[in-house]
């Protein structure tokens, strides 16, 4: 008999609805314009990640949350710090009278409930309703059946499952730390101070003789918005002579290059679009704006893209790519959009970007250093996510084993051995 068999042998449970044992409430909307990029407390709303940060909180640490509305509705999380709960998320807090009635330890019972809800996450996400913004109803949450076990069994289940979640969290933290380390060195290498220093060392010049000068991107490159032939369905083609039609879905996660497209448009359609050449840059001008990509193919872009071209005599492609991904530039885009009435990254804003004008040989030196950092990071990102995925699957396996009970017999159902 396995340890799980032994732990759950003849375990009797009592079933309660989540709404009977927990306070389930939505948060309060906070004006997005008043949020900060860095602040004391995260704002948890309908998404998976914080919407921003503020210096106020309305929920204490160690609280379960469930996203109520939006694409991530039904996502279950556990916040270990104080936070602000927005209007598009629920908090799930055990009732004190239940804790007292069953003699539960609050910490273990709270984590037990988290694991129960995490097991129900897919069902919650599948229950989303609404033609506009999909949402999970409070009634759906209230109706989730929760097995109330003995204190001893509950504690052992939580300790077992938390070992897996803690390990996954540690791996994710390590991956994040490696990424931040790379970003730190990238931004340092691209700073004006470092470019001055490396140019002085490279050419044996005094700083005053070789000082980095800045111009705007619009002065040394062509920046344009894409264009869409309409209706686009009229111009989609399977013809081998068709022009690749570049869409956001054609680009892989964390990709640097656009290598292929799922669709092509006719030559006639391309005349009403913007045709780019291999080596040109594109950036999304709305939603997740400002992320650069290098074309590894010729293609046409719609009006959700901006293009950067005709810069190769002055700028090295890899140097430009790293510069555009830097925190300094990404922060520049945010500042321009937040301080104006526009809600997207238009061509005028892109043209206004200050950019260092340095010798191309020096650009290539910086780019090669960053290539090495990027390669090391890619190796790390290749290994750690695999380990995270493996541990996550182990957690889900044991969670199903430990939390699957038979409602009719009020005893644990366990038919598999490990």
Regions inferred by a protein language model and the residue ranges of each:
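Charged, alpha-helix-forming regions
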Residues: 1-418
């Amino acid at each position: 008999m396995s340890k799980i068999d032994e732990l759950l042998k003849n375990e009797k449970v009592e079933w309660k609805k989540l709404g009977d044992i927990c306070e389930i409430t939505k948060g309060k909307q906070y004006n997005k314009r008043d949020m900060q990029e860095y602040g004391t407390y995260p704002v948890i709303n309908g998404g998976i990640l914080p919407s921003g940060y503020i210096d106020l909180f309305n929920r204490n640490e160690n609280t379960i949350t469930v996203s109520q509305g939006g694409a991530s509705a039904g996502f279950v999380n556990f916040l270990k710090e104080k936070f602000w709960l927005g209007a598009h998320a629920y908090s799930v807090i055990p009732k004190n009278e239940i804790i007292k009635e069953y003699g539960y330890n609050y910490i273990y019972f709270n984590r037990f409930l988290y694991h129960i809800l995490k097991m129900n996450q897919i069902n919650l996400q599948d229950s989303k309703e609404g033609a506009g913004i999909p949402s999970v109803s409070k009634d759906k949450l209230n109706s989730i059946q929760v097995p109330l076990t003995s204190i001893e069994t509950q504690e052992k289940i939580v300790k077992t499952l938390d070992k897996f979640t803690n390990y996954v969290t540690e791996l994710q933290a390590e991956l994040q730390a490696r990424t931040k380390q790379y970003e730190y060195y990238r931004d340092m290498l691209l700073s004006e101070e470092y470019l001055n220093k490396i140019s002085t060392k490279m050419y044996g010049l005094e700083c005053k003789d070789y000082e980095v000068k800045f111009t705007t991107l619009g002065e040394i490159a062509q920046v344009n918005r894409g264009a869409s032939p309409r209706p686009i369905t009229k111009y989609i083609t399977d013809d081998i002579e068709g022009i690749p039609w570049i869409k956001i879905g054609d680009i892989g996660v964390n990709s640097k290059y656009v290598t292929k497209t799922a669709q092509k448009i006719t030559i006639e359609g391309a005349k009403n679009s913007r045709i780019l050449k291999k080596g040109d840059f594109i950036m999304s001008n709305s939603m997740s704006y400002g992320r650069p990509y290098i074309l590894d193919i010729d293609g046409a872009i719609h009006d959700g893209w901006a293009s950067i071209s005709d810069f190769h005599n002055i700028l090295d492609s890899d140097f430009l790519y790293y510069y555009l991904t830097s925190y300094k530039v990404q922060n520049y885009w945010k500042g321009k959009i937040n301080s104006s009435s526009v809600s997207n990254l238009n061509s005028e804003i892109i043209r206004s970007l200050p950019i260092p004008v340095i010798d191309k040989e020096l650009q290539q030196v910086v780019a090669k250093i960053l290539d090495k950092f990027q390669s090391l990071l890619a190796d790390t990102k290749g290994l750690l996510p695999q380990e995270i995925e493996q541990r996550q699957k182990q957690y889900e396996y044991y969670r199903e084993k430990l939390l699957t009970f038979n409602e009719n017999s009020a005893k644990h159902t366990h038919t598999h051995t490990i």
